Amino acid sequence: MTTTNNRRDFVKSAATLAAIASPLSTLAQSFDFKPNQRYPDPNVFILDPSFAKYRIYSSTIEQVGTGMRWAEGPVYFPSEKAGAPGYLLVSDIPNNRLMKFDEATNKFTVHKTNVNYANGNTRDRQGRLVTCEHSVTRRVVRTEKNGKITVLADSFEGKRLNAPNDIVVKSDDSIWFTDPLFGIGGEWEGSRGKSEQATTNVYRIDKSGKITAVITDLFNPNGIAFSPDEKKLYVVEWKGTPNRSIWSFDVNADGTVSNKTKLIDADGTGTLDGFRVDRDGNLWCGWGYNGSFQATATDIGGGMKAHLPNAKAEEMDGVKVFNKDGKAIGFIRLPERCANLEFGGPKRNRLYMASCHSLYALYVESHGAV
């Protein structure tokens, strides 16, 4: 017994040291992603020693569902029976449907169609589904336990919302959501529409149903989440200048926010999207190559230069983890760009990653903040 434990400890320690010591240039090597049986999973990178404790060395990335056209808005519903498997819903926006992954059966099926191009989803404190319908209807709705749909917001100051995108519910039952332009910009994820709002805002719906614009100076706000103590609000500015960013705000007792501070700045080729905060305050961020034309001029002879991209999609697609101070500490490499995440599983330690066409899962040594 002692010998076996010592061997396991040695293997784990060696793997930890190797992962920490591995040069970050390994991320720049092209690869063919294949779910593997090797422990530890070579697609989970420790960028800082502080991330080592979150990595489970006998856990590998699994593809638990596929066949979507753009996966977004994962939300987990725990079982009513403590410790039992629950299920996860995820938006397949272009196909105008919600998909369902059942943890008990491992089946991935269509949950509901004609969902008004649902994007972000969350669960309120009463266990009800709250959804951003980001095209056509352009509203935030709640699905009651009997299946009835309640409209929570579809306009502000007499003008239609743009395209509600991502959403979070605070412990005081207020609902906070972002309202960029994505859902009305074309036909792929709904129908082209006209913006009636002068700005792209972050809104708060209080318990009485009153809607307030709490942030009005972000261009196309996207992912949104609170810190574990709810004293900070984090919001992605998807069209930030010069780069996409996550901004931090202090949350005041009256429901307003203040002290806008840039927490995370994506590089010129990186894309921040949806994200989740764990109980330690780390931000697990959907990440990927943004398709930008930033390039390096390379001499190819004859006085000619080729402009080669500074990054490859396969170097960047996945989940990037930052600590509460904005330092990158970990990276989970995926074969598809990750748009959004959710902590699920009976112990809330299974990280679900909605990524382009597929849904991936990885057990981690962490829990979601909510």
Regions found by a protein language model. Name each.
Residues 62-65, 107-112, 150-156, 211-215, ...:
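A short beta-strand motif characteristic of beta-propeller blades
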Residues 141-174, 178-185, 190:
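Asp-box/WD-like beta-propeller blade repeats and closely related beta-sheet repeat scaffolds
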Residues 31-59:
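Blade/loop signatures of beta-propeller domains
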Residues 2-18:
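N-terminal secretory signal peptides and thylakoid transit peptides that target proteins
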Residues 35, 178-196, 289-312:
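Short, conserved, GDST-rich strand-edge loop motifs in beta-rich repeat architectures
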Residues 97-99, 139-141, 201-203, 245-247, ...:
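A short loop-to-beta-strand structural motif that recurs across blades of beta-propeller domains
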Residues 102-106, 144-147, 206-209, 252-253, ...:
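Short loop/turn segments that connect beta-strands within beta-propeller blades
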Residues 66-85, 114-133, 139, 157-175, ...:
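Beta-rich, blade/repeat-based domains predominating
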